[in-house]
């Protein structure tokens, strides 16, 4: 068991320091599990590839296929037609649409589609004035926070959600949470977070929005041809089919296989070539997810997670048994760790410990997975944060300053919902 904890500590140091490439970290974690006698090679190999890993691979490929269709213009027209009556309503619409789509298709997909819309409407804003700078930040953060918040909403919103579902199925005797069950737990948190985020951003970036060109952008995208319309329509049908299948067949087929079916449809219909998918798929990330999931399984199987929980309980023995200290510690720990270590890897490695704290209470595992999606503090915490920072318009200091308030609010929202709403499910 202690060998698995040594590997866990080593992986954490290597990922946070980026001392070696991610694929090398993944392979090293796999090899060391065998060399240090954590488990036989066949056992390690079987835990390396499961539905959670297939989902990570399938969702990344599916995202590439969707972005390749150029749906950003089509989506912009829909948003403007619904929310275009005022600029602040439009920003609220950007956030809501980003969140809803991100909850089903993943934040890495939606930030790639939505960010060009935001950049287009702020291209003429003068960033040298405080009002103009705040307008730029308000638009960009509205999209970014929408995609980050939305990723907790459904199992397909993020790999960490699927990982936790697998862990709950493997390590507990509770009834398995399906696609709709996860939505019942997570979507109320998502909705409250959106409302809080809107007012947090309005407070953090006060601006008149004078130079934000919503109507000008509407005129620039007014023209489109019928061939593009047909392609977009067919793409939407494929997306709808996959989302419906996640709802109806997630237990029979698995989320990963369904995601891969979507990729196959796009390729078979000639809508995206394999070369594009192969070139843009981050295979190193897939390997790292697989390795950390495998390590997470072994941490539980070897009893390492039970040992950690026993040590934790000894440290907190002075607290009342019915206190929420354990829950708060686990939620804050996973939330903070994910801001430096990626949410999926955090859930893979700390998820077994969260479940072990209360094996018969899924709120501990669910809270850990959801809290790991609160990627508000650092620009390396999520694909959305990294893409936002890469624009050169958002500084690390600003991201942290606004994110600290949003992170604290999100932990409080999660606690209140789990305390008063989850108990009714």
Question: What positions do the PLM features span?
Answer:
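Alpha-helical transmembrane segments
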Residues: 51-61, 103-113, 182-198, 363-373
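C-terminal ends of transmembrane helices
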Residues: 10-17, 64-82, 267-276, 335-336, ...
